[in-house]
Amino acid sequence: MQNDNKIKIFLVDDDALFLKSLEIQFLENADFDIETFATGELCIKSLDKNPDIIILDFHLDGIDKTAMNGIETLDKIKNIDAKIPVIMLSSQDKIDVAISCMHHKAFDYIVKSETAFVRLQKAISTIFKYQKLEKELDWYMDRM
């Protein structure tokens, strides 16, 4: 988490309307520092800003058909920094798509719907609980 106690979230989606509505929901409901990106490439170029969480669209095919899709972007993010939690978003509710994302080391997979924001909030809360437990475990392991 960032020093100013704001959670830095990267939102990556080629659907400008969905991206803006999600950004507004985050800014209205909690103390987040939000950066939005229309392509995976733009997100990758900004990883030096150290996001706490990345919320990434599965397809990313609306703006440039030759751009990286969500899975390719996820793989690049994990190659650069495996510890950044990435939540995948998609309009697809197919289980094989969700499983594929999890195999590529996504933290969670959420279907775009009217409840997506609530599910994202819960996933973010889970991420920070998990990270706290990891730190405690590391602390105990160091003392063994």
Describe the predicted segments one by one.
Residues D13:
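Conserved acidic carboxylate
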Residues L47-K49, K76-K83, H104:
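Conserved phosphotransfer cores of two-component systems
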Residues M68, E72, N79, Q92-I110:
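Alpha4 helix (beta4-alpha4-beta5 surface) of REC/receiver domains from two-component response regulators
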Residues E35-I53, D57-G62:
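Acidic, metal-coordinating helix/loop segments flanking the phosphotransfer/catalytic sites
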Residues R119-K132:
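Receiver (REC) domain switch/output surface
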Residues I55, P85-M88:
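Hydrophobic beta-strand core positions in alpha/beta domains
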Residues A16-E35:
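Two-component/phosphorelay signaling modules centered on CheY-like receiver
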Residues Y130-L133, L137, M144:
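Heptad-repeat alpha-helical coiled-coil signal-transmission segments
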